[in-house]
A protein has these predicted regions:
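Terminal targeting signals and extreme-terminal segments of soluble enzymes
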Residues: 1-58, 66-124
């Protein structure tokens, strides 16, 4: 069939989210070493056009909200060749400890994410 499986879009959202964190100088390993995880509590995806196996894609990730207890991101997945929107989506993560209790993200991480989100908001 040659069409990308629908679950791959959620993986691409994750890739976009991780890239966003890195852009803010927030890396997964130090968070996990401190016992901070951020499970998905809500996800949505609207499929706009079929992606094909050989398509090169671009994932646009924009912070809708960054608070000390949660992150909400919006995504647009585009085909590089023609700019066609393949999917749009949204995720919400909450910050928890390893036992699943909601926690506040330490300021050393939150401040970096909030600063990048503010820059993004100003650019829109």
């Amino acid at each position: 069939m040659g069409v990308v499986h629908h679950a791959n879009y959620l993986r691409w959202f994750e890739m976009g989210r991780v890239a966003y964190l890195k852009e803010a100088d927030v890396y997964l390993n130090p968070l996990m070493e401190e016992g901070i995880v951020f499970p998905i509590t809500d996800v949505s995806c609207k499929y706009r056009s079929s992606g094909r196996f050989d398509d090169e894609i671009v994932i646009e990730t924009v912070a809708e909200a960054i608070t000390p207890v949660k992150m909400i991101f919006n995504y647009t997945v585009r085909r590089l060749a023609d700019g066609a929107v393949l999917a749009t989506g949204r995720t919400q993560n909450v910050f928890t400890n390893k036992e699943g209790k909601i926690i506040r993200l330490p300021a050393k991480y939150y401040d970096k994410l909030a600063q990048l989100a503010a820059i993004d908001a100003a650019d829109r």
